[in-house]
Amino acid sequence: MGESSEDIDQMFSTLLGEMDLLTQSLGVDTLPPPDPNPPRAEFNYSVGFKDLNESLNALEDQDLDALMADLVADISEAEQRTIQAQKESLQNQHHSASLQASIFSGAASLGYGTNVAATGISQYEDDLPPPPADPVLDLPLPPPPPEPLSQEEEEAQAKADKIKLALEKLKEAKVKKLVVKVHMNDNSTKSLMVDERQLARDVLDNLFEKTHCDCNVDWCLYEIYPELQIERFFEDHENVVEVLSDWTRDTENKILFLEKEEKYAVFKNPQNFYLDNRGKKESKETNEKMNAKNKESLLEESFCGTSIIVPELEGALYLKEDGKKSWKRRYFLLRASGIYYVPKGKTKTSRDLACFIQFENVNIYYGTQHKMKYKAPTDYCFVLKHPQIQKESQYIKYLCCDDTRTLNQWVMGIRIAKYGKTLYDNYQRAVAKAGLASRWTNLGTVNAAAPAQPSTGPKTGTTQPNGQIPQATHSVSAVLQEAQRHAETSKDKKPALGNHHDPAVPRAPHAPKSSLPPPPPVRRSSDTSGSPATPLKAKGTGGGGLPAPPDDFLPPPPPPPPLDDPELPPPPPDFMEPPPDFVPPPPPSYAGIAGSELPPPPPPPPAPAPAPVPDSARPPPAVAKRPPVPPKRQENPGHPGGAGGGEQDFMSDLMKALQKKRGNVS
């Protein structure tokens, strides 16, 4: 050990000597003349070597573990950067691929080539910014899928399910159920299955469905005790099965389904219960002037506050003594906890009041016929008793009021004190039910009336015209058929008359054929004119002019048939002669005269003219007068000329009457 230290010292001294020689050689060659301060250079060298030694010592003292930790941290950071760069490159590739696919599909749908798509893709890749990094969501991992159960576990699970189902069925079987017979106000009954989970509101809803009534808020279940002669209505929140369970097996009690305005009268007119006792004169005026807004505010103040406000009721009532039929008059006060009375010789202060009954375990009932049964002062009684008391008992309290108004106020006040806000909630639920039912009813009536209007409207509109037009058409067609038949019969008679007088036949039709205009224009003008047309005078032969029948008697033939038909000759010249001075007798009387006295008549006029007359040419009354026309035109020419003026006046009056009738009909 001593030798090694000596060797080190020797080596160190040798090194120092060599360093001195080196510095001397460098100073002789390069440096200027020696500096007056050579010891400073030695100091610098000695200082530098000292710093080197200190740095070496510091390196030796430094912890290698810390260096390794730093190195590992640098390596991990580099790896993270590499992984991040790879992710970004993959995202860019996916984004560019999706963009390329969308652009290519759009270009393909528009009919562009692949070159355009490629250029568009490259352009979009250059212009688009890099996609944002995926947000890191701290979402819980989905639960692992359940492991498949073994056969034993499946059997155990199935057994547990069966046990659970059996327990549910057992629980359902334990639910108490009753068959309730509900009496209607028309003496009919409805049977309902009611279980212990149903409230009176549920039973009412079932009855609404069965009876199809209007779901008014006044409908209620009404409980009647014939033995005690008391009755009441169920509150909507009461359990029906619990109440019916208190009845005895041989009871005569009944449940009715009827309307009672007293059930929710306080919510319709709250001023009658809250403001009635503050002043009789003021309350009457207030009751008359109370509007809906004030009623609503009064209800909110009474039922929607921190505590329920019970009506301030107090007054003298008659109390039935226990076990007796005698009644005593006492002064009672209504409070939220019960009814109190003022003992004899005491005041109405709270410390002097005595508790009469509390509302916790009693129900309120109306008394019926208590004046007859219990010798009550009036028939306006109410009763307070426990629900389980079904027969006469000393624990039943009977009170009697002076009038119906006082009775209703006390009964409603007791209900408000007993049920509180629940009563208001029941009313709101009943109103909502009634409003929903009314909306459905209105919707049903609107839907039912909508198809009825178009069905009845056109029906009535069509029946009136169809009832009139067919009748008119039928009458016109019947008249035309009758006229045609009459014309055919007269046509059969006309050739017979013409055969007897052949020499006179050919003269009349051929002479005026070319000179006279066709008659239809004259007839048409007479048709359209309001007054009878004046017939034109024809230049015919013969001294006596025969009268042409008025145009009103002749149906105007349509223009085409008489012009185009060569078989129909024009009317005779005598047709246009002035009216005669006499009125020809009716056609039936001429039939016998024509065969013996009359000269040969001219050829018959065209008989089928009345047949083709259209229905719209003339009104039905004018057409009805057409049948007698052919006989007049045949037989008038045979009369000698000359007639009186009185007959002409008669003819003109007849024409005016017919024209007036036509105007009334049209």
UniProtKB/Swiss-Prot annotation:
Region (Disordered): 122-155, 448-666
Modified residues (Phosphoserine): S55, S526, S531
Keyword match Cytoplasm: yes
Entry keywords, A to Z: Cell junction, Cell membrane, Cell projection, Cytoplasm, Cytoskeleton, Membrane, Phosphoprotein
Swiss-Prot/TrEMBL GO biological process terms: positive regulation of cell adhesion; signal transduction; T cell activation via T cell receptor contact with antigen bound to MHC molecule on antigen presenting cell
Main location as per UniProt: membrane
Compositional bias (Pro residues): 129-148, 547-589, 598-631
UniProt-listed SMART domains: PH, RA
Protein name (database record): Amyloid beta A4 precursor protein-binding family B member 1-interacting protein
